[in-house]
């Protein structure tokens, strides 16, 4: 993602989704179900049977609900309220987060064909061109990272997590994914 003119919106997940949708289209964005300033504002009756809650300003502040009838509201409140208190500017001196207001976003729950949640695809672009990508699998329990070049050759290095147990298949829509990454990088 190019930082020219966009630094202010990419630090907040809800704003980043809107910015990204303007560039590549809403059809490529996971639907937002709501955004709230606090956990107590969430109207759980309005949420579907499955959903995802996450804080808009950090990483790791995620609660996945696969079955609303068995949802642990107390644990979700505890986790998200803790994440809402996390301040990247004060804790890590990350200046772009200085004036970010922490919020909670609800998104549609999605999973891959294997029923194990979504694979996370990240493209690394240099000078506007995708040059490398990684696929994160098995999140959040047993996270695996696999890096690939743009010919989908597995790269022989790791970053904090082991490789997947078996070979990963090239996504059917890989070329479209690469083109969308290119658009975002310009």
PLM feature spans:
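Short beta->alpha connector loops
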Residues: 34-39, 109-113
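Short beta-strand to alpha-helix junction loop
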Residues: 10-16
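Amphipathic alpha-helical regulatory segments at dimerization interfaces
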Residues: 22, 183-184
């Amino acid at each position: 993602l190019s930082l020219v003119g966009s630094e202010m919106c990419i630090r907040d997940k809800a704003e980043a989704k809107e910015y990204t949708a303007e560039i590549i289209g809403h059809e490529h964005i996971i639907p937002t179900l709501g955004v709230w300033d606090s956990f107590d504002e969430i109207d759980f009756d309005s949420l579907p049977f499955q959903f995802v809650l996450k804080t808009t300003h950090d990483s790791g502040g995620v609660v996945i609900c696969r079955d609303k009838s068995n949802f642990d509201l107390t644990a979700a409140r505890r986790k998200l309220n803790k994440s809402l208190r996390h301040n990247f500017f004060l804790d890590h001196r990350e200046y772009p987060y200085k004036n970010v207001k922490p919020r909670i976003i609800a998104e549609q729950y999605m999973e891959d064909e294997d029923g194990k949640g979504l694979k996370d695809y990240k493209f690394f672009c240099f000078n506007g061109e995708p040059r490398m990508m990684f696929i994160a699998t098995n999140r959040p329990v047993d996270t695996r990272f696999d890096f690939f070049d743009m010919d989908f050759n597995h790269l022989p290095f790791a970053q904090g997590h082991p490789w997947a147990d078996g070979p990963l298949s090239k996504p059917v829509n890989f070329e479209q994914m690469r083109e969308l990454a290119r658009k975002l990088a310009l």
